């Protein structure tokens, strides 16, 4: 076989070809595999099937942690339960010879399994007697995988997960625009207004209008943090979100420099008209001054007509 990095091989090779390649193992004496591994420095293949994994303690090289993780992620991705059980059973003292392998056992394995959304392996790891795994510690990884089954398993098998961890999981779901996860976490008590409404603000950053509307329907206190909300609505400009926030009467302070500048620069006249219609006071003279500098004629004409009417 040509020597290529395992990650590249796994990403560019059909699963049937991978299986055919691994079947070659039965035709080659283990002593030869051991010699090939020592000479080439490529230990990845030893971590992809039970028969070769047993050679690991006899190899005279050290593999970087990231190479081990590539192999472990492959095992989890392709649901190689028998190989994983071999690792878990710890049939040789790899902790003594290769201390870095301790990172794979078993908390790190649970971390990677939740990250990959593999419920079967999560259940296997959780079933280990006298394990030191605290399921709630892996809630964020499960959320990142967007695996509702793994998230539900964690809630159903841990007990009372602290409010802070649930809120952090909600925050991650908003960053990833995962509506199903958001709905589930809110049903489990996630506080949508915690930490200055940060979860809602993360939803604003993504511009996902469906999620934004869901938060509002669930009682998000958007007017308590209107400045931050408008900032992220305007950086960058999200036209559909702007229209929606106006439709629900979101307060706006046009004297705030971080709101004022993008409105003038992008000539968002509808927001200025909105502020005037709602009676929100702001320095119109200053707004006209900066509009002249940037030659924003529609803003100049509109505000000058308002100023003249007030005189």
UniProtKB/Swiss-Prot annotation:
Domain of life: Viruses
Ranges for the ANK repeats: 67-96, 105-134, 136-163, 165-194, 195-224
Species of provenance: Acanthamoeba polyphaga mimivirus
The entry's keywords: ANK repeat, Repeat
Pfam families, per the entry: Ank_2
UniProt keyword Repeat, yes or no: yes
Protein name (record): Putative ankyrin repeat protein R825
TM annotation in the entry: none
Disulfide bonds: none
């Amino acid at each position: 076989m040509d020597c290529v990095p395992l990650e590249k091989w796994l990403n560019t090779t059909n699963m049937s070809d991978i299986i055919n390649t691994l079947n070659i193992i039965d035709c080659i004496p283990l002593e030869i595999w051991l010699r090939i591994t020592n000479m080439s420095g490529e230990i990845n293949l030893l971590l992809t099937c039970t028969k070769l994994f047993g050679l690991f303690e006899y190899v005279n090289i050290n593999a970087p942690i990231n190479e081990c993780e590539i192999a472990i992620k492959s095992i989890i991705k392709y649901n190689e339960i028998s190989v994983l059980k071999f690792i878990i059973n710890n049939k040789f003292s790899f902790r003594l010879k290769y201390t870095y392998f301790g990172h794979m056992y078993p908390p790190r394995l649970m971390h990677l399994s939740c990250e990959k959304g593999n419920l079967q392996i999560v259940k296997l790891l959780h079933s280990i007697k006298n394990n030191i795994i605290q399921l709630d510690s892996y809630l964020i990884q499960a959320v990142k995988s967007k695996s509702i089954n793994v998230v539900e398993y964690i809630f159903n098998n841990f007990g009372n997960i602290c409010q802070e961890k649930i809120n952090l999981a909600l925050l991650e779901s908003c960053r990833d625009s995962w509506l199903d996860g958001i709905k589930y976490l809110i049903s489990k008590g996630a506080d949508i207004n915690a930490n200055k409404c940060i979860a809602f603000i993360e939803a604003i950053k993504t511009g996902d209008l469906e999620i934004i509307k869901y938060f509002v329907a669930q009682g998000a206190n958007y007017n308590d943090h209107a400045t931050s909300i408008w900032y992220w609505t305007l950086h960058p400009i999200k036209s559909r979100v702007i229209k929606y926030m106006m439709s629900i009467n979101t307060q706006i302070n046009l004297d705030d420099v971080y709101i004022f500048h993008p409105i003038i620069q992008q000539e968002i006249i509808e927001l200025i008209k909105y502020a005037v219609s709602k009676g929100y006071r702001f320095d119109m003279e200053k707004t006209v001054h900066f509009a002249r500098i940037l030659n924003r004629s529609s803003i100049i004409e509109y505000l000058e007509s308002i100023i003249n009417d007030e005189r």
